[in-house]
Amino acid sequence: RDYLENYYRPNLRVKSRDGLTPISPNIVPKEAIPDPHNLALRTFVNGELRQEGTTADLIFSIPYLIAYLSDFMTLQPGDMIATGTPKGLSDVVPGDEVVVEVEGVGRLVNRIVSEETAK
């Protein structure tokens, strides 16, 4: 339990705020992804590449994550497992455009807004 508290909870607090967990503009069937274990991942901030990696770089493999989570929760078709991002943190400020790409899945574009603007 300590591991989960310390390893996963900070990411959940940062990346899963109410109304602020954008996932993808597309739903892609598994048949459209030839190798989910080696998809390119990229993040751009204002057009500048800030993160780059692949799903092969994940700390835990996709089959391991599915097996691990299945031990204590029921996974259903269509469920999403959030794993984090490639190395390279990037500060963003209101007005910045963040683009995230997953090879074969698509590209998600978001603009950062202030809390006051979001209300």
Named regions from a protein language model:
Residues 1-72, 88-119:
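Catalytic-core "active-site belt" of small-molecule-metabolizing enzymes
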